[in-house]
Amino acid sequence: EALTRDSVESAKKSGQRVSRTEAERKAKAFIQNIHHFRDDNLRTPHAPIEKVVVFDEAQRAWQKEQVSKFMQQKKGIPNFDMSEPEYLISVMDRHDDWCAIICLIGGGQEINTGEAGVSEWIQSLKTKYSSWDIYYSDKILAEPNTYLNDPDLSNWLQQHGHQRTDLHLAT
């Protein structure tokens, strides 16, 4: 939606006419659904063409058990043993040079059954991808029990990540 709006407004400012439908079509070609991204990368061990992925509502990513059940029942893949955050990081970690994962986290929402929360992203980075550069909003640690309520993971993030005040969408 934001890309569509921006494209139409930018075209207007430069004296061009772009229809909302055309802008939306281009935006959809630019953005891939996370589930398609996941499925595409199950088929290959190679790095994806995408260098940047944005995971909206990242706190809703699935725990290992939920993903494993889904992969077995819906995709016919037995013994899938990664959470959604760990899998996404593993796919992007295939790049030899650089890549980025941007996790957008909604505030004030309960975590539902099977959802991993922010802690699973941090746990995956801590246990398997500790060489990654991590940048996070100061809001992640500002309110106890809101985003990250595991003291060990909070401490690890503070020691290994880079806290920024300008990464919150309210900025």
Question: What do the predicted segments below correspond to?
Answer:
Residues 2-18, 52-171:
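Conserved helicase motor core of SF1/SF2 NTP-dependent helicases
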Residues 2-53:
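Inter-Walker segment of RecA-like/P-loop motor cores
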